[in-house]
Structures are given as structure tokens and as C-alpha cells.
Amino acid sequence: MAKYNTGGNPTEDVSVNSRPFRVTGPNSSSGIQARKNLFNNQGNASPPAGPSNVPKFGSPKPPVAVKPSSEEKPDKEPKPPFLKPTGAGQRFGTPASLTTRDPEAKVGFLKPVGPKPINLPKEDSKPTFPWPPGNKPSLHSVNQDHDLKPLGPKSGPTPPTSENEQKQAFPKLTGVKGKFMSASQDLEPKPLFPKPAFGQKPPLSTENSHEDESPMKNVSSSKGSPAPLGVRSKSGPLKPAREDSENKDHAGEISSLPFPGVVLKPAASRGGPGLSKNGEEKKEDRKIDAAKNTFQSKINQEELASGTPPARFPKAPSKLTVGGPWGQSQEKEKGDKNSATPKQKPLPPLFTLGPPPPKPNRPPNVDLTKFHKTSSGNSTSKGQTSYSTTSLPPPPPSHPASQPPLPASHPSQPPVPSLPPRNIKPPFDLKSPVNEDNQDGVTHSDGAGNLDEEQDSEGETYEDIEASKEREKKREKEEKKRLELEKKEQKEKEKKEQEIKKKFKLTGPIQVIHLAKACCDVKGGKNELSFKQGEQIEIIRITDNPEGKWLGRTARGSYGYIKTTAVEIDYDSLKLKKDSLGAPSRPIEDDQEVYDDVAEQDDISSHSQSGSGGIFPPPPDDDIYDGIEEEDADDGFPAPPKQLDMGDEVYDDVDTSDFPVSSAEMSQGTNVGKAKTEEKDLKKLKKQEKEEKDFRKKFKYDGEIRVLYSTKVTTSITSKKWGTRDLQVKPGESLEVIQTTDDTKVLCRNEEGKYGYVLRSYLADNDGEIYDDIADGCIYDND
């Protein structure tokens, strides 16, 4: 509270405003003596509670933690050790006060030293000042006595330069603190407190009673436990108290430098990898304990001498609060380092992990046949993965037990939490019990390996399925194409069959009656079938064909007529086949339009009746006369006795399929002649119809065409040029007179059905005109 009391002291204001921060070694020592006297004078007086210096330093509010009782205020006396803590306040407050201070004053504190221990090194009043931004405690001010030190939580980060000794005396963790203390000791003969153990806090401080109760809490926090307030200064490298003497030797030089703060910034202050090992931690613990004991003893002595227990170190919480933004920035930097370092750190050595677990037993039921394809290529990689999975899990339980504080302060520890992500096998481990019912949790590695193979096999299976689908699609496409081709071929075949049926006058389905073997090579014609000797020929039809020919088909699908003499025929089998096909054969034979193969049918029937195939008879002559064929059949082909027993009467309507007797053949001969004439008549009729149309159109003839009489052309006709309407006639040709146009010519029609004019001179004498009306029955018999 001395700081508040000194608010009315003019000297204090002057000193504050003037800010004599740049003080060399000798000047600083004289200024310190003057301040000590002021502190003693003010310590006896009761200082007012209101903080007069606070607005000067720009501190928005006094430190919550440190409020010394009124009893303690008069008892406190300015002591050089108290000046050291001001250095601590400067260290913590420097970042915030850099803008307000003179460049000289800022020089010493441009860069805050790395993480700083929570515990203040000594009972100095100023170390307790928390530095809110812009709050600057002035050591030269009257407030700087031990009473001010309790107000230290407010302390601005920049103590006056006259107290450079004190600034330097303030310990930075162990190393930096030593440098400050050495500087103050050189400048002042006053004894400096040994550097307090890190994080030690006087139990008498009211606000931080929880920290004062156990200084070891700060020590433990400084070791590696993350600072609750985000101040990473605790985790900074802890330098043993031994180094204080060495740091003191260089402190004088540092204080004289224009920027002592730059020199005082050790790289180790922000935490270094040196503490990553357990051995180093133990050494640091020993050093901290020694410094703590020494510091605690001196604190007790001073308390007894001065009787001002509240003037002890500023409360650690004040430091923690003061170090807010700067400590957070350091935390971020360390966090970045820690986040980046695990990627660079290798896995822990094998000796720390211990021996790997024994290889699990092979599962009782394992079928590796489907994995043989990929087992050779993946055997090495799978072995490595299994080893990593078995060896990596043990470290997490071992490290927390042996090195609990390391994760917060050392970058070497973060790899441990990052290990589980590397061991990404949980989904496979979940599946592994299915294949390994009798295995322990240690066997997950083997299960994982097997599952890798299973995955490979599953992948292959999926690929096979996709390939099979593609194959099926291809097959479907090919099948569709094939079906389309078959349909086209079928259509073409049907179309061809229709043409063949129309061409060869086939009715009904095409059936093979007999298989014949070619006995010679035949070069077919327009409708004849060409084949080679020994080739099999299918007999399609043996009736309704030209004389001496059958309708056959080769293996190539060609249709045509074949001569019966060019193939070898088994008549016995043909007879049986014909009997089976008798029903469909009858309508063909009954068909009156086709009679060309009737003679052949007669010959075949006669040969089959003889029982011995014999030599197939030569085809009959084109000219067939009624009666002659009947006689030949009677003479050359006697009827079998069975047919004779049937009776003497012979009927003309007996079917040829029943192999009639010669009398039936005779009747068939007459039918053949009639059929041919009828066929000719049909052709003539068609031709005549066409000619008649032309005639009516050409001669504009309407009405019924009636033949008046018939006549013949004279044999003495001379050739002449015929007109467009003249009928070309031949000598002796018979004509039918249709109309008598005039005396010179008549309209006639010849046998071919053509019409035209014919001169009367070309016609023979027509005496018959007189007898046109005589009926056939009117025949005069002179006898």
C-alpha cells in the first residue's frame, strides 16, 4: 500500500514523469540508495489507500490479489531484494508498456524473455505488480518501497531505469533471473535474495492463498503442467540456481547496454527440447528444490527482521493475469512448435516400448487359397503393418505414468497422442473377432493382416462381379445380334423357300421323302440341280415333276430337278416311305393342274411291283399317244398275281398309289393325254385372253366374239409385207373367221389366238360355207 501512500509525494511524481529509466551502473546505485531512504520514510507513515501512481502508469485497476494489511505497511522497509521483483514486473509488463515508454526505457524490455516462472524470485514489492496493458510501475517513485511491492500486481511492466539493478535482479526463470540479480548486485552492495524456487509464493499473500499454501504447485506447474492462465513462462527452461553467479558476472554489462532486454532473452527461456528427457527433468527438479530452499530461508530471515510478511513476493496469479496476451502469444508459438514437431519426431525407440507381444496363434479355421494370388506381393507390407499395430499400442499407457508433465512443456511428447490416428485399424479390429474367435486382443494385428487380405479378395470379387456384368452385357448384345441375324437368315430362308415353292409348285411343308446317292457328276441347268458323284441328295418330291426327273435338294440347300438315272435309289425304303406319306401324296396326285410326272409315277410303281429294283427304265419319249402306252405297260410289265385276284373288273378311278394293274395304267394313259391337252388349253386360254384384249383395243371390237366358220390358208400363198392389222398366216394354216368385213378380206383368228385381217385370196375355196348349218347328226348315208 506504500505505493498508494506515496501518491501525494511530489518527488514520486517527478520521478514517475521523468522516468529516469536509462541509468548506468553507478547512477543506478545512487538512485537506489535515495529510493531506499524514501521508502524508509514513507514506510513509517501510513499511506493512503487510494493508488496515486496507478493512473500514471495507466493501470486500469489495482491488482486483485495483493492487499497488505495496515499492520504490514509500516513494518515494511525498502530493501534491495524488493527491487529485484520490479525486474520481474518489468519483464511481464514490458510488452504492454513498450508504446508508452521512452525508447531507452524500452530497450531493456523490448522482447519479453521467454516463459517465466510463476513464483517471483524475492519479496520485492514490484514483482507482484501485474502489468495490465499500459500500466508501468516506476521503481524510482516513492511507491516502490516494500508497500508498493504488494501493489505489485498492478506494477507496470517497466520499472524505472534507476532500478536497472532491480530489473536485472529480477530472475527470468532461473537463467534470466540470475542475470538481472547479478546486475543489481554489482550496482548495489545490497544482498539479493537467492532466486526463489519457480512458482513459490508467500503463504501470507491474501489473494493467492491457494498458491501460497503450496509453493510446490508452482514448481509442478513449471515442470510441464499447462499453466491454467495460459502463461507459458512457467514451462520455459529452468536454469539451476548455480548459474546465478555466472549470470551476475555478466549482469553489470547487460545493465549498461542500451537494450539489456535483448541480451537477456535466452533462446532457452521459451522452452527447449533439452527437457524432453527424464534425466534432465530430474536435474531441473534438484536445482529448483535447492533454489527454493535457499530462497525460502532468506525470506523467513527477512520477515523476522522486517516484520512485514505481506511484503513478500507478488502473487503468482497476478503474474499470470499480467502475462495474459504475451503469455498467450508464447503459448501459441509453442503450440505451433508442438503441433509441428510430432510430424518430425520418429516413433519411440524399441527399448522404451519393450519387447513386442508374442505372435498370436494361427486361427483354427482359415482358408488361404483365395488369397494366394496377392499373398506374395503383400506379405512384406502386411508383416510390417502387423508389427506396427502390435508395437505401437503399448506406449500410451507407459508414458503417462512415467512422464505426466512432459506433454505440456516438451514437444517430444505430442507424438504419443498422434499415434492412435496412425494405427487406423479399428474397423478391421472389429471384424477380426469374427475370424478369430479364440484370439486375445493382442491378435488384432494378425486379424488386421488377414482382413487386409480379405479386403483385397473382396476388391477382386467386386471387380469380378463388374467384369461378369460387363461380360453379361456383351453376351446379351451378342445374343441380340445373333438373334437378329438368325431372324434375318430365317426370313431370307423363308423367302427363298417361298420362291422355291412358287417356282417348283410345292404345297405344304417341305419333307424329305428319300435320300439318294449321286452315281455321277451332273452339271445342272436352269432348274436342274448340279452335284458330284457320291454326294447325298434329298428327294423332296417324286410326283408332279418333269418326266424322268425328281425334285431334290443338296446339303447346301440348293433345289432343283435331278434325273432318276443319275442317282442310286432304294425302292424298298422309298416304298415304305411313300406308304407313310400316302395321305399327303394323294392330294398331289389328284391335282389336275400338274401332270408332267405321271409317266414317271407309272414307271416307279411298275418297278416297285416287280420286287427287284432292276434297271430304272429310260424316260419315255416326249410324244405320248393314247393306247400305245397302255399296250406297252401290258406287255412289258405284267401285273402281280395279287392284283389279278382282286377281280376282273378294272376301274379307272383307282389311285396310282395302290399300284393298279395294267388296265388301270391304260386308263391313266388316257388321263395323261387329256391332262396334257387340258394343260395346253389352259396356256392357250391365257394367251387367247391376252390376245383378245389386244384385239378389242386394237380393232375397237365390242360384243361377243363368234366364229363364223373355219378355213385354211392356201398352200400357194406368196410372202408379202403384212400390215399392222393383218394376220400373218402360213400356208395350210387353219383359221377361224370371226367377221367378214368386205369382199376382199375377212377378220380371222389363228390357232395361237391372234387376230387380224386376211385377204380372201389367201383362203382356200370354202365350199363348206354351204354346209355350215348342217348338224353332226345329219349325215347322209347313201347306202
From Swiss-Prot:
<feature type="domain" description="SH3 2">
    <location>
        <begin position="700"/>
        <end position="768"/>
    </location>
</feature>
<keyword id="KW-0963">Cytoplasm</keyword>
<feature type="short sequence motif" description="SH2-binding">
    <location>
        <begin position="462"/>
        <end position="465"/>
    </location>
</feature>
<keyword id="KW-0539">Nucleus</keyword>
<keyword id="KW-0225">Disease variant</keyword>
<feature type="domain" description="SH3 1">
    <location>
        <begin position="511"/>
        <end position="572"/>
    </location>
</feature>
<feature type="compositionally biased region" description="Pro residues">
    <location>
        <begin position="392"/>
        <end position="424"/>
    </location>
</feature>
<dbReference type="Pfam" id="PF07653">
    <property type="entry name" value="SH3_2"/>
</dbReference>
<feature type="modified residue" description="Phosphotyrosine">
    <location>
        <position position="651"/>
    </location>
</feature>
<feature type="region of interest" description="Disordered">
    <location>
        <begin position="1"/>
        <end position="502"/>
    </location>
</feature>
<feature type="short sequence motif" description="SH2-binding; to LCP2">
    <location>
        <begin position="595"/>
        <end position="598"/>
    </location>
</feature>
<dbReference type="InterPro" id="IPR001452">
    <property type="entry name" value="SH3_domain"/>
</dbReference>
<dbReference type="GO" id="GO:0070161">
    <property type="term" value="C:anchoring junction"/>
</dbReference>
<feature type="modified residue" description="Phosphotyrosine">
    <location>
        <position position="571"/>
    </location>
</feature>
<keyword id="KW-0677">Repeat</keyword>
<comment type="function">
    <text>Acts as an adapter protein of the FYN and LCP2 signaling cascades in T-cells. May play a role in linking T-cell signaling to remodeling of the actin cytoskeleton. Modulates the expression of IL2. Involved in platelet activation. Prevents the degradation of SKAP1 and SKAP2. May be involved in high affinity immunoglobulin epsilon receptor signaling in mast cells.</text>
</comment>
<dbReference type="GO" id="GO:0050852">
    <property type="term" value="P:T cell receptor signaling pathway"/>
</dbReference>
<feature type="compositionally biased region" description="Polar residues">
    <location>
        <begin position="1"/>
        <end position="18"/>
    </location>
</feature>
<keyword id="KW-0965">Cell junction</keyword>
<keyword id="KW-0175">Coiled coil</keyword>
<feature type="region of interest" description="Disordered">
    <location>
        <begin position="598"/>
        <end position="678"/>
    </location>
</feature>
<feature type="modified residue" description="Phosphoserine">
    <location>
        <position position="573"/>
    </location>
</feature>
<feature type="modified residue" description="Phosphoserine">
    <location>
        <position position="28"/>
    </location>
</feature>
<feature type="compositionally biased region" description="Acidic residues">
    <location>
        <begin position="620"/>
        <end position="635"/>
    </location>
</feature>
<dbReference type="GO" id="GO:0072659">
    <property type="term" value="P:protein localization to plasma membrane"/>
</dbReference>
<keyword id="KW-0007">Acetylation</keyword>
<dbReference type="GO" id="GO:0008289">
    <property type="term" value="F:lipid binding"/>
</dbReference>
<dbReference type="GO" id="GO:0006955">
    <property type="term" value="P:immune response"/>
</dbReference>
<feature type="modified residue" description="Phosphoserine">
    <location>
        <position position="329"/>
    </location>
</feature>
<dbReference type="Pfam" id="PF14603">
    <property type="entry name" value="hSH3"/>
</dbReference>
<feature type="coiled-coil region">
    <location>
        <begin position="456"/>
        <end position="507"/>
    </location>
</feature>
<dbReference type="GO" id="GO:0015629">
    <property type="term" value="C:actin cytoskeleton"/>
</dbReference>
<feature type="compositionally biased region" description="Basic and acidic residues">
    <location>
        <begin position="69"/>
        <end position="79"/>
    </location>
</feature>
<feature type="compositionally biased region" description="Polar residues">
    <location>
        <begin position="25"/>
        <end position="45"/>
    </location>
</feature>
<dbReference type="GO" id="GO:0032991">
    <property type="term" value="C:protein-containing complex"/>
</dbReference>
<feature type="compositionally biased region" description="Acidic residues">
    <location>
        <begin position="451"/>
        <end position="465"/>
    </location>
</feature>
<dbReference type="InterPro" id="IPR035540">
    <property type="entry name" value="FYB_hSH3"/>
</dbReference>
<feature type="short sequence motif" description="SH2-binding; to FYN">
    <location>
        <begin position="625"/>
        <end position="628"/>
    </location>
</feature>
<dbReference type="GO" id="GO:0005886">
    <property type="term" value="C:plasma membrane"/>
</dbReference>
<dbReference type="GO" id="GO:0005102">
    <property type="term" value="F:signaling receptor binding"/>
</dbReference>
<dbReference type="InterPro" id="IPR043443">
    <property type="entry name" value="FYB1/2-like"/>
</dbReference>
<dbReference type="InterPro" id="IPR029294">
    <property type="entry name" value="hSH3"/>
</dbReference>
